[in-house]
Amino acid sequence: MAKALQGVMAALLTPFDHQQQLDSESLRRLVRFNIGQGIDGLYVGGSTGEAFVQSLAEREQVLEIVAEEAKGKITLIAHVGTVSTAESQQLASAAKRYGFDAVSAVTPFYYPFSFEEHCDHYRAIIDSADGLPMVVYNIPALSGVKLTLDQINTLVTLPGVSALKQTSGDLFQMEQIRRAHPDLVLYNGYDEIFASGLLAGADGGIGSTYNIMGWRYQGIVQALREGDVAKAQRLQTECNKVIDLLIKTGVFRGLKTVLHYMDVLSVPLCRKPFAPVDEKYLPALKALAQQLMEEKA
């Protein structure tokens, strides 16, 4: 199973319609688009998927739809994290029921939980996942949970934990984790340092911009396998030019707008309180969509 979890995993967006409801047909198209561009797997219901502005029922519905479209074709990881242990357990049980390959959970946030409470939270989710491997999700910039290296080392050695999504710019820590845990599946979480993360020891990555240019990230993996660091750097630079624009537009709404121009998503909206893309960026996003479609063809 550890080998199956390695690779380039798109952090899947969640499409909504003009009434702010889940757009299931666009979701299905997005899953098929990702499969078609050679993604190794999907990370479903995470930060990129706007999980924390969805109800539990909606999150379960997303898991069900994605499984219907992709089960058996690519690796599927269900992010089931919430502040509530019981709700996370409910989502973990759903992931097992729908045939996902693994579950993942961000560290519980907002309240100042003790580290032992964090550990108990993960143990409970792992138990409810009924044998599915756990991917611990460390994203201190958004969760506000600043784990020490020793705490990370403890979490990844809990029974049932097989992987870590390390969304941090600390590449020294990435290398330290890899050195301490050679058999751990280690994901780079920040797209803009994907190549550097691989060189620091990551097995692959989970990222939002893979939704629109996953083949570039696969190209970085292949270039480094072949020892062509210069090519990997060039591809990373091309990815980062896109990320520069998306940071200006707002990453999730920018990605959805590009996918709208690619005829993948019917509506390019995020769920409120996220606002639509500023109209001044639409020409640049449309040009980017055209460029990527030509590159992918």
Curated annotation (Swiss-Prot):
InterPro entries: Aldolase_TIM (IPR013785), DapA-like (IPR002220), NanA (IPR005264), Schiff_base-form_aldolases_AS (IPR020625), Schiff_base-form_aldolases_CS (IPR020624). PROSITE patterns: DHDPS_1 (PS00665), DHDPS_2 (PS00666). Coiled coil: none annotated. It is found in: Cytoplasm. One of its GO terms (cellular component) is cytosol. The keyword Endoplasmic reticulum does not apply. It comes from the Bacteria. Homotetramer. This is N-acetylneuraminate lyase. It comes from Salmonella paratyphi B (strain ATCC BAA-1250 / SPB7).
